[in-house]
Amino acid sequence: MAKTAAKVRKKVKKNVAEGIAHVHASFNNTIITITDRQGNALSWATSGGAGFKGSRKSTPFAAQVAAEAAGKAAQECGVKNLEVRIKGPGPGRESAVRALNALGMKISSITDITPIPHNGCRPPKKRRI
């Protein structure tokens, strides 16, 4: 019994003028996802995916490289205006926003959406270095 060849679907190129850049900056990594207004992902990049491993992932430079990669992919989809939403306490917060701005994208607003507990779960113990 011969197998029929699977139909190859051509990837539909999205053309979106406005987008939202979600920057998730943890202590260990930085994840940048650029979505349209409805929340559908257009492009994404991480510090680890940009070639940084171990403790180098948690540097501002790694976040900058990841933001440039995500931004260039989003520009191919036609994104020109961005709204930035930052979540997390990581070191890559500022540099990711600066990298997106340096690509020539117009940033309309920067919002910090870091979740803050109203006395919820007990936090992890303090680090002793």
Curated annotation (Swiss-Prot):
Domain of life: Bacteria
GO molecular function: rRNA binding; structural constituent of ribosome
Keywords recorded for this protein, A-Z: Ribonucleoprotein, Ribosomal protein, RNA-binding, rRNA-binding
Biological process annotations from GO: translation
GO cellular component terms, A-Z: ribonucleoprotein complex; ribosome
Keyword RNA-binding: yes
Family from the record: Belongs to the universal ribosomal protein uS11 family.
Subunit structure: Part of the 30S ribosomal subunit. Interacts with proteins S7 and S18. Binds to IF-3.
Entry function: Located on the platform of the 30S subunit, it bridges several disparate RNA helices of the 16S rRNA. Forms part of the Shine-Dalgarno cleft in the 70S ribosome.
Name of this protein: Small ribosomal subunit protein uS11
Protein species of origin: Aromatoleum aromaticum (strain DSM 19018 / LMG 30748 / EbN1)
Upper classification of the organism: Bacteria, Pseudomonadati, Pseudomonadota, Betaproteobacteria, Rhodocyclales
